[in-house]
């Protein structure tokens, strides 16, 4: 039986195309067909803004900075009967303050030609708006991680009296059971679990409340904790998978400390740029693996919450385009260094 003599309705002037491997060989047969686009935008996975909501945040109006008072412990002593109590038992006072200053206005902007918006088969403006908002969110999270790291590495005592010493940050350095060439994933996971426990104990020794403590790890190290013999082992956590499970790919707590994952725990060294008003942003997290912290370790000032501005009127007419601007005004800084511990390698 003879092959069919097909009328290829996608050809231009009846020519083009060949029966061969590859899309290019078929293009001639499909030249007149409509090039459809998917309604679903294939965008990058959104990074989670993990640190927001886990640190102290304050709104500010009518000012450029906010002072947080630092008070220390008071001492107690026996009273000798008959002697006058003059209030000098805790004299001189031991007070200080930390001042957080707003940085310059932070923006993420994009200008889109109106003609392009009309021709696009997908909601281009909505996607651009989302990406601009995410740019601000990611910068918020990255800066917060650097400030927590700065708190953990802060070795300056804020107060003078001996009773108030020790209010500085802490670090835990992972050993050969993590860094060794022969270290297994299970051994590395156990090392991280032990380090998280050490971090919690270090804060408890400084009278840091155990509530509101969080631990954030990078993706690699969060996955290593899953391979630990203790994090999700039923011998340590009871049955029922109440602390997560290997199948779910999640661990809820280690020694009572909730675990979270963020891509911002490890960062290259940051150099201050024009607009930064806090030298503590300049940190090198390239060897950092985890941050264990109480919410009081740092503060965030917010003068202007993330918002979107869209141009209209004369600007659009003269340029035949639309300008989209996402903006926020904030400042960050260390508050209580004793409330932060950084876990990393040497």
Language model features with spans:
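N-terminal low-complexity, intrinsically disordered segments
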Residues: 62-96
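Generic alpha-helix structural propensity
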Residues: 50, 61-63, 80, 90-93, ...
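Structured, hydrophobic secondary-structure cores that serve as assembly/anchoring elements
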Residues: 62, 67, 97-124, 194-228
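Alpha-helical scaffold segments that mediate packing/assembly in large oligomeric complexes
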Residues: 115-202, 344-346
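Sequence/fold signature of self-assembling virion shell proteins
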Residues: 2-52, 59-60, 69, 73, ...
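Surface-exposed polar/charged interaction patches
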Residues: 12-15, 150, 202, 206
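Residue-level signal for secondary-structure boundary elements
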Residues: 53, 140, 144, 156, ...
């Amino acid at each position: 039986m003879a092959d069919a003599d097909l009328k290829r309705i996608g050809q231009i002037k009846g020519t083009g195309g060949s029966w061969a491997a590859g899309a290019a060989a078929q293009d001639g047969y499909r030249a007149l067909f409509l090039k459809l686009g998917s309604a679903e935008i294939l965008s990058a996975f959104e990074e989670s803004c993990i640190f927001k909501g886990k640190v102290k945040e304050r709104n500010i109006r009518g000012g450029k900075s906010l002072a947080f008072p630092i008070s220390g412990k008071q001492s107690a002593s026996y009273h000798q009967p008959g002697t006058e109590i003059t209030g000098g038992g805790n004299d001189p006072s031991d007070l200080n303050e930390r001042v957080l200053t707003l940085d310059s206005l932070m923006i993420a902007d994009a200008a889109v030609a109106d003609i392009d918006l009309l021709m696009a088969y997908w909601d281009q403006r909505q996607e651009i708006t989302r990406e601009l908002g995410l740019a601000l969110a990611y910068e918020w999270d990255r800066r917060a991680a650097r400030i927590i790291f700065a708190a953990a590495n802060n070795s300056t005592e804020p107060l003078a009296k001996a009773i108030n010493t020790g209010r500085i940050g802490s670090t835990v350095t992972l050993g050969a059971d993590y860094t060794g060439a022969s270290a297994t994933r299970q051994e590395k996971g156990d090392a991280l679990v032990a380090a998280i426990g050490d971090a919690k104990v270090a804060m408890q020794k400084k009278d840091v409340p155990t509530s509101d403590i969080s631990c954030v790890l990078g993706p690699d190290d969060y996955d290593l904790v899953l391979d630990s013999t203790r994090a999700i082992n039923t011998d340590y956590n009871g049955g029922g998978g109440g602390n997560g499970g290997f199948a779910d790919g999640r661990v809820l707590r280690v020694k009572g400390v909730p675990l979270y994952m963020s891509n911002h725990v490890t960062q290259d060294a940051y150099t201050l740029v024009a607009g930064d008003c806090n030298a503590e942003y300049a940190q090198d997290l390239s060897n950092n693996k985890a941050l264990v912290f109480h919410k009081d370790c740092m503060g965030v000032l917010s003068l202007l919450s993330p918002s979107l501005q869209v141009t209209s009127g004369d600007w659009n007419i003269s340029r035949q385009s639309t300008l989209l601007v996402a903006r926020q005004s904030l400042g960050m800084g260390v508050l209580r260094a004793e409330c932060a511990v950084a876990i990393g390698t040497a």
